[in-house]
């Protein structure tokens, strides 16, 4: 499908402290037109560097910083590294399932994750309503990849599904688990995309200076959107 977009109406937020690089200021461009809020249009907007939060579609539009680089993986061309292959071998006893709704005990897992990993973030303290407002939307198919150790839920990866691609929206997991569950969630999302014949898995923004956000370049073959051209 074409990834071209023509003129769309956007609004700019005020500058505010960056969530990922605290010493910098960020602002975002928000897509304002209601007809952009469809699965087909969002797929095009993803290819042009946009993301969503709830029903809001946005992209970074900072005055002097270009650290946020949209990144995606070409599913047919995926090349696993040695460490990723070792991780999958260690995870052979785990299972995953893509579901339309989260298991009833999801919030206990989510709470442990937020308290352990993001106590200083905007999602603390963890609240069900806040997460629903953040993750749900009214115009896109969103499913939930569950990872189990036996019968125990150890990770959930919120995944937006479109005709030709999927988007890794948000992942939470057992914070003290010995395996790299965030990486494993992406590997299982890639397995899902292979099964469903998707072309791309979008991973959001790569931020080299932010340790929590610079792991995404470890997945090959990836592309980054630089100067409005996908490279890689």
UniProtKB/Swiss-Prot annotation:
Top-level taxon of origin: Bacteria
GO CC annotations, alphabetized: cytoplasm
EC number: 2.3.2.29
The entry's keywords: Acyltransferase, Cytoplasm, Transferase
Reaction it catalyzes: N-terminal L-glutamyl-[protein] + L-leucyl-tRNA(Leu) = N-terminal L-leucyl-L-glutamyl-[protein] + tRNA(Leu) + H(+); N-terminal L-aspartyl-[protein] + L-leucyl-tRNA(Leu) = N-terminal L-leucyl-L-aspartyl-[protein] + tRNA(Leu) + H(+)
Gene Ontology biological process: ubiquitin-dependent protein catabolic process via the N-end rule pathway
Record's subcellular location: Cytoplasm
Pfam family, one: ATE_N
SUPFAM superfamilies in alphabetical order: Acyl-CoA N-acyltransferases (Nat)
UniProt GO MF annotations: arginyl-tRNA--protein transferase activity; leucyl-tRNA--protein transferase activity
UniProt xrefs under NCBIfam families: PRK01305.1-3 (NF002342), PRK01305.2-2 (NF002345), PRK01305.2-3 (NF002346)
Function: Functions in the N-end rule pathway of protein degradation where it conjugates Leu from its aminoacyl-tRNA to the N-termini of proteins containing an N-terminal aspartate or glutamate.
Family: Belongs to the R-transferase family. Bpt subfamily.
Designated name of the protein: Aspartate/glutamate leucyltransferase
UniProt organism field: Vibrio vulnificus (strain YJ016)
């Amino acid at each position: 499908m074409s990834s071209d977009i023509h003129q769309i109406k956007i609004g700019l937020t005020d500058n505010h402290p960056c969530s990922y690089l605290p010493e910098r200021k960020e602002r975002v461009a928000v897509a304002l037109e209601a007809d952009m809020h469809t699965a087909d249009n969002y797929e095009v907007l993803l290819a042009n560097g946009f993301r969503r939060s709830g029903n809001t579609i946005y992209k970074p539009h900072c005055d002097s910083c270009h650290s946020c680089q949209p990144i995606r993986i070409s599913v047919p061309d995926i090349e696993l590294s040695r460490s990723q292959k070792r991780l999958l071998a260690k995870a052979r006893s785990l299972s995953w399932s893509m579901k339309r709704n989260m298991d009833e005990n999801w919030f206990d897992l989510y709470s442990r994750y937020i308290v352990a990993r993001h106590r200083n973030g905007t999602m603390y303290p963890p609240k069900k309503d806040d997460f629903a407002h953040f993750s749900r939307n009214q115009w896109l198919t969103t499913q939930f990849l569950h990872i189990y150790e036996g019968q125990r839920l150890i990770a959930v990866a919120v995944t937006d599904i479109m005709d030709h691609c999927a988007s890794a929206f948000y992942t939470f997991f057992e914070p003290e688990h010995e395996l790299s569950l965030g990486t494993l969630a992406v590997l299982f999302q890639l397995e899902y995309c292979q099964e469903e014949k998707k072309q791309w898995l979008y991973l959001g923004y790569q931020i080299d200076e932010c340790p929590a956000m610079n792991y995404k370049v470890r997945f090959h073959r990836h592309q980054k959107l630089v100067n409005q051209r996908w490279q890689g």
